[in-house]
Amino acid sequence: NKHTILLHLGMTGKIFILKNNKVFKTSFYYEKLFYEKHNHFIFNFNKSEILIYNDVRKFGFIKIFKTKNVKTCSHIKNLGPDPLSEQFNSEYMKRTIPKIKKNIKNFLMDQKYVSGIGNIYANEIIHLSTINPRKKVYNLSAKKISLLIKNVKKILREAIRFGGSSIKDFRGIGGDKGNFQQKFRVYNREGCTCKKKACGGLIKKIYISNRSSFFCSICQNN
């Protein structure tokens, strides 16, 4: 009908597809049980199939608008490039960095500069790139920028290959937990030894813009 549904899951949003009152195993964030009191939207497709949006913390949202207006929607038009796309490259960074006074951690998590990188992966990317999370973006050398771009793509592809990171809520489309949390280099490893060879530093935890940040006391001390 020339309309589009935009759905954001937030932190705890889940989609359940029911057929004859039974949850499909293909439900996104599939679980066998869910609390009906957290159902916020119900879409009836036919007499036997319904889609339910369930969200405990209510950080997500659903919007319906005309398809022709998708690119002008405020939630989409201000997004930065996909980090796995060709558009996220050295030339893009060279054009963007001079305008930015943020530290590297906040830059990676700011959706208007690069979309889709959350706290976990920002920590992992910065560590692999041996950059202090408090370092200002405009102080990065061209060599570090190239390394950062390379590691953004490397970490995200590795996380996808392992099914994501299931610390608490996240589940894959079939209800399975991800396994990338077993590969964490710094995230949630406060007090542990750095995994980089010949480093020996300890992982420290600080807060940057009220978000937990983990980094190595030696190889990221720059």
What are these language model-derived features?
Residues 1, 44-48, 196-198:
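Short acidic, glycine-rich loop/turn motifs
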Residues 4, 49-50, 202, 212:
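Short, solvent-exposed loop/turn motifs
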Residues 5-116, 121-128:
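Phosphate/anion-contacting hairpin/loop surfaces
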Residues 15, 92-222:
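Basic, nucleic-acid-binding surfaces and adjacent catalytic neighborhoods in DNA/RNA-processing proteins
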